[in-house]
Structure formats: structure tokens, C-alpha cells
Amino acid sequence: MSAGPDLGAVFDEHVASEFETQDIDATMRTMVDEPYVWHVPALTGASGGEAVRGFYTSQFIGHTPADAVLRPISRTVSSDRVVDEFVLEFTHDAEVPFMLPGVPPTGRKVRVPTVVVMGFEGQKIAYEHIYWDQATVLVQLGLLERGSLPVADADEAERLLELAGGEEPLPA
């Protein structure tokens, strides 16, 4: 009985192509011909091969702050899906159009728990759903008042890292 494809390895290759090597062609090779990517809180992403390539080119790959790191929390792998939970940390020293479209750099630090759900067709990524608490990001950037609303700041990321054992960061 064969073990089947290592979807976690495909996930890692995809993320390394996005963040480390910033290689759009390598990123697209990990995906089906007509994938979609959706950053739920910011309403950014694209559907279809050329549109996803355009999104990666204009808003994602090469548009991540230089000091960004991913601190792993957990990963669940099934036969057709990988769910990755991590804390994304960065300094908002450049525009981040996939997360904060139209928001000029504030110079502030951000730490936000993030969940990525990648669905697969065989060994290729068919879709990505990415979730984070946008209110938490806006509070950390000084764009939303915390006091009167039930929102957190970087404390939520700190507590999650404490509870999960605070794994070493991965380059983003």
C-alpha cells in the first residue's frame, strides 16, 4: 500500500516559493492550471491561472515586508487538504496589498495568528483560503481603537505562541 503524495511537502515548497525565493513560476508549478487564492479578511485574491499569476505578481510575491516570519503553531494533513496555523510577524514598513490594500506603511510591528487551508487535486494545490483577524492587525497599526471594541492586539499572538510552545520562526 503506497502512502500517497506528501501534501505537507508540496505546501512547504509553495510557501518557500512565495516567501523565500519569491519565484512566481515555481509557485504556480505547485498549483493546478485553474486555482484560486482568497485572503478572506481583506477580500483579496484571484481565481483562474492567469488571474492568480497576476495577483501574485502585483499584490503578493515581492510585496511582503523583508522582516516577515512565520511562527508555526500546528499543521493538519488529510488526503486532499493541508491546514496550517501560524503567527505571522512583520514590520509594516512597506505597503502590503494582499493584507492591507490601500493602507500606507505605519512602521509598526504586527503579530497575527493566521490559518491557511490548502485544498489539493492530486499533488497540486487547487485553492488557498487564508484567514486572520483583521481588527487585530488594524489595532496594532494604530488604525482602530482597542478600548471600546472586543478586539485584541499582539497579545493574542503572544498567548497562542506560549500555549503552543513557541516554535522557532520560519523565514517568510
Can you say where each PLM-predicted feature lies in the sequence?
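C-terminal and inter-domain tail/linker signature
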Residues: 1-172
